[in-house]
């Protein structure tokens, strides 16, 4: 009788050595994001982080998100170095709207066969996003799962925890008629609406490499999500912010009402900004109705801030000094009965 061939985990499609190589490759990216509150080093069973001592009544704020089908485009066009920024942005931008300073971030990277070079590029991007937001990358999970993903496909998820002083939580309760609305420009579609983006590319049979305003269309589509944390933390400290809305999935119609009292509505001046070219291209080539555009995409507006009207000039000056493109986009008005909570004029 012949002796059965001994099997290893690698024979089953899981390469532990590749995982170890990845950990070695990302150490510099992780170290760059370290905050003084972080305890211990990468590789422990659990990651430890103290709450900053400046907080008297700290409230932890958490969020989790992914990059959605933007990953499909990134994988197809081998653009792996910025999807990590997208991942962090989608989480930390959700935290900042409640006034929370991001503390730490963890990522989950899942694939059928671990490509160390690709994974290193992705995690380095996560490190860059954490650096941009002042958030420590303190841990994560790399799951190599043969038979679960096809070819070079992978998926990402992120989890972030931030902290805010209990008395300083921004929850929209101070919003009142007469408040002004300031918009902060997006860098592109960010990480929302990409199933529709891909459908437009399919139906129009457009060449993703075609020129659009001086650079390939695909570069517009894969532009990383803008991170607003540092500029908005400064604005929160300097001004009286009543509410903030991160314009993500659901666009204007779904996200702005999340931070408004029932008796208030947002009146948006649709002519106060010009849509970036990529949104006009999507609308034209997909024959998408304007209502659907505002429901699916940010249309050039990544964040909306509600604040007293007499604080607008100072806020715009501060944001400009921080490198943000911002403008007065509308105002809060009294809402009657079952009126829609968002009007775009």
UniProtKB/Swiss-Prot annotation:
GO terms for molecular function: ATP binding; phosphoribosylamine-glycine ligase activity; phosphoribosylformylglycinamidine cyclo-ligase activity. Its EC number is 6.3.3.1. Pathway: Purine metabolism; IMP biosynthesis via de novo pathway; 5-amino-1-(5-phospho-D-ribosyl)imidazole from N(2)-formyl-N(1)-(5-phospho-D-ribosyl)glycinamide: step 2/2. One of its GO terms (cellular component) is cytosol. It catalyses: 2-formamido-N(1)-(5-O-phospho-beta-D-ribosyl)acetamidine + ATP = 5-amino-1-(5-phospho-beta-D-ribosyl)imidazole + ADP + phosphate + H(+). It is found in: Cytoplasm. It is an enzyme of class 6 (ligase). Keywords: ATP-binding, Cytoplasm, Ligase, Nucleotide-binding, Purine biosynthesis. Signal peptide: none annotated. CDD domains: PurM. Disulfide bonds: none annotated. GO terms for biological process: 'de novo' IMP biosynthetic process; adenine biosynthetic process. Belongs to the AIR synthase family. This is Phosphoribosylformylglycinamidine cyclo-ligase. It comes from Shewanella sp. (strain W3-18-1). The gene is purM.
